[in-house]
Amino acid sequence: MSNTPRTVVVAAGLAAALSTGAEATFHLMQIEQVIGGVNGDVTAQAVQLRMRTGLQNLLGGARLWVRDATGSNRILVMNFTAGVPVGLAGRRVLITSPGFNSTTSPSAVPDFTMTNLIPASYLAAGTLTFEDNLGIFVYWRLSWGGAAYTGPNDGDICNDPDGEFGPPWPGPLPSAGVQALQFQGTAAAASSNNADDYALTSGSSEWVNNALGVFLLESPCPWDCGDSDGEVGIVDFLALLGEWGVVGGSCDFDGGGTGITDFLALLGNWGPCP
C-alpha cells in the first residue's frame, strides 16, 4: 500500500485539473496592440488581445492592469466578467475607451469597454499586464519607456519561455498620432522580449474585434503621410519623394499620383497637425 498521504494525492490532482482547465480558457493570449491616445487625446485608448491557440475565449477569470514607471500604483484597465463568442486561434479581443470609438472608420464596435483609462502620467513609462483574477499569474506583459521603466518584467512561462518579458519597448506608449504599439510576431508566437517584439505601426493603425469587424484609425492630418507621428516634417517629405508618381500612395493627397500638387500641400501644412 502506498505511503503517500491522501491529501497530497488530492492536491496534486486538483492542481493538474486546474492547469488543464486554464489551458482551455484564456491564458495563451498576446497583448497584440495598444494605443495610449489618438492625436494627443489621451481619453481615446484601445487594447487589442490575440489568441495564440483556440479555446482562449473564456475571459471571465482575467484582468488587465497597468502600473507606473516603477511597476507600482496599479490601475484596473479591464475586469473581464464574460468571454467572447469565438475562440479560434488568431481571433482578437478589442477593448476600448468610449472616446476611442468615434475616431475610427467605421466607428469601432469593441468587445469590451475599459474599466479605467491608462493614466496620462503612465504613458511615458509603465507596464500593462494580462493576469488572472487572483493576481497570481502574469500571462503577458508589455512594458515601455526603456530605461525610464524600473519595475519588474517577469511573467508566466506559458507565453514567454524564460518568464522574462523585458527589456521594455524603448519609447513611450504612442498617443500623439494614429500609430499603435504592435506585437510583430504571428498569432502563435510566444514573447521573446518587449524591445524586440514590438514596433510602431506604419501609418494608420487597424483594429479588429472578435467578430472580425475592422476599424481603421485614420489621421485627420493626411499630410503626416510618412510616420503618422502627429507632425508634418522631414520624414513625411522623404516619404512623398519616395513615392513620386505613384497613384494611391500614402502621400497622394489628390488621388492623381504623387506629384507637385501634393508636394505643395505638404509644405503648406508643415509643422504640428491641427
Task: Tell me the role of every PLM-derived stretch.
Residues M1-V9:
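Bacterial N-terminal signal peptides that target proteins for export
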Residues V9-A12, A24-L58, A62, T70-N73, ...:
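Intrinsically disordered, low-complexity linkers and terminal tails enriched in Ser/Thr/Pro/Gly
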Residues A17-G21:
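N-terminal signal peptide c-region/cleavage motif recognized by signal peptidases
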Residues I35-V38, M51-T53, D68, D132, ...:
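Sec/Tat-exported extracytoplasmic proteins
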Residues L58-G61, G90, G230:
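A glycine-biased structural micro-motif
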Residues L64, M78, V93-I95, L128, ...:
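Hydrophobic beta-strand residues in large extracellular and virion-surface proteins
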Residues N79-T103:
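Intrinsically disordered, low-complexity Pro/Gly/Ser/Thr-rich segments with frequent PxxP/GP/PP motifs
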Residues L217-P274:
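Cellulosome-associated attachment modules in secreted, modular CAZymes
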